[in-house]
């Protein structure tokens, strides 16, 4: 049953995120939700450390966090926003749902992200109908836009 959950808490820590998102190490790219307004927007972040496996090959002498993983972190944040907007914070329902990417549009990478950065995701709902959600926004470090994108996803039943 689709409904709106306007009374959600605005911050979620890693133990909450793990109960809603199915991603796990090394693909969980959200450490904390710092702002959430159901059906409207989300702000979240990931702390980038030199211990990330990806830096073994991207690039050995000049570590740069891959742009595709920045977009994936934005998508995970958008998925958390969509799920909690529909069902609130409900780990039992989360076990039965999964969010799939449909499209990625208007992607731009502006500044490299490196170890020591706090990568913030800022996304707004552009539109949604039923289980289809379109979000857009930016990834930022120290208030500077490092990437931007529009993403469309659908929420489906897990098999």
Swiss-Prot record:
The keyword Lyase applies. It holds the Pfam family FabA. The keyword Lipid metabolism applies. The active site is at residue 58. One of its GO terms (cellular component) is cytoplasm. GO terms for biological process: fatty acid biosynthetic process; lipid A biosynthetic process. Involved in unsaturated fatty acids biosynthesis. Catalyzes the dehydration of short chain beta-hydroxyacyl-ACPs and long chain saturated and unsaturated beta-hydroxyacyl-ACPs. Belongs to the thioester dehydratase family. FabZ subfamily. This is 3-hydroxyacyl-[acyl-carrier-protein] dehydratase FabZ. The gene is fabZ.
